[in-house]
Amino acid sequence: LLTGNGLTSLPPSLAVAEQEASVTSLTTKRYILRFPALETLMLDDNKLSNPNCFVSLAGLKRLKKLSLDQNRIFRIPYLQQVQLRDGSGDWVGGRGSPRKQPQSMLQSKSWIYEASDDQPDYTILPMKKDVDRTEVVFSSYPGFSTSETTKVCALPPIFAILPVALFPSLCELIFHNNPLVAHTRGVPPLLKSFLQERVGIHLIRRKIVKAKHHILMPRKDSRKVKTQVPKVPKQPMILPHPSVMIKSPSKEMLESEAELTTEPPPTKTISVEREMPIEGLGGPPMPHRTFVPLPPICSDSTVHSEETSPRSDAAGRLSADQLSDEDTKSTESIFLTQVSGLSSSIFQRDDSEIKEKEQRPPSTAPREAKRTQKKPPSASFPRKYHGYEELLTAKPDRPCSTCVKHPLVYRSSKPRLDTLQKHYVPKEKRTRRIPVPPRRKTRAQLLDDILIRMRDTQNITEAPLGAVLRQRTEQRLVNQKQFLEAKKLLKEFRARYRRLVRCSLRSVFGTTAPPQARPALSGSQPKLGRFLEFMDEFYQEPTASDLKG
């Protein structure tokens, strides 16, 4: 295993080594195989590019699997087969059977695949056009002849794998991720028919990728959306409070009002109070009204403002239509805030108070003016919000308030909505105690256990005889071997009992023929086992001397 070592070349004496001169004579040379039993060689993920590396591998006669992936190999040379003598005197041949020759000199022989009828099935011809490109000369290696040029087949680059057939016992070749097969796909039919089907070399030119298991995501029923949630409007629907429309007159109008207010009629304040809610809610719709802004608030002088409506019958009041353009331009605007959250009970109370005041005699104007400032207008809802009056009169719902105070936070897929849920509190993680590993046995103890197991190889199964014999037919089929052993044991007990009875009768009556033995006890009787155990313990079979006497 030489994976990922960054090797650029292999030593020439990797597989075959020459003996020393002291051992051999000067006239003869002998070579020894270094790895005669090597069958698998992994040279993947290296930088092998020189064809000389195949010269180093040519002496491995039992090489079956060769891995050359992720290297820089662009061709494999054709090597002349040379017969070598190993230490035992055998000649190293090719895929054919090795043979011996009396000569000790190296004899080169061209490689030709011969069939059974001694005629060449195929031959390898050299390329005549470009000899320098295909010629490979190995001058320093003693085991291969360099007298003849290397023969290369005039085929596309993928056919440079054909010289692999010269390896005697090669069965599998892995050569992907090399320049040799970088620009081609698949195995050509010629290589497949020759190398795989004839010679028996399995070619692997693609990296084997293990199939990944398909990831299945479980579908949970709780995650399915079965109902459509209605769209929430951007602006919530809120019942608006009746807006107050106020006008600010000019200086001339203020002076005229001052003259009129010196002698106010007693019924004027009542009409203003009754007209205020009508103007706010019962009057014309919002887009048709004329809004008049308020003047700036001054601390020195007080500004009197009044509200007018087209329905008012009070004389001496100026309406918004009578204002001139100059007066409206001279005024400044002030924004009023909307009061929300008022219950309808307040509005109903104001309506009842207004009715009582209408029935009562009118009082002084300043007191009534102070009261009007404190009382809000009555509630009269427009048609747009018809049907929502109960929202203002409804009492607070206790279940709703508890749901708001206790939000539902679940960690389970099926929560119980009929009960109050507790807040999720994460549990503290507790570290588990690591179990103490058993004490490791020494080598002597392990060896003793192995010897004990080898010595005692019997497997003993204890079972009551009566329970095994009383089993049903279904259980007998399951434990058929156990039932047969119990039946055989019962047969032996019966034979031993008969033998005991015969021996006892012979000892009593002498040579007289014993009477016919009674049938043995059935195996279903529970006392049979105890009786046989008692007889085996206290009775010994009679010897030959006892029988003679």
Swiss-Prot record:
LRR repeats lie at residues 37-58, 62-83. It is found in: Cytoplasm; Nucleus. Residues 227-236 have a biased composition (Low complexity). It comes from the Eukaryota. GO terms for biological process: response to X-ray. Its main location: cytoplasm. Residues 348-360 have a biased composition (Basic and acidic residues). Keywords: Coiled coil, Cytoplasm, Leucine-rich repeat, Nucleus, Repeat. Residues 480-500 form a coiled coil. SUPFAM superfamilies: L domain-like (SSF52058). GO terms for cellular component: cytoplasm; nucleus. May be involved in the response of cells to X-ray radiation. This is X-ray radiation resistance-associated protein 1. It comes from Bos taurus.
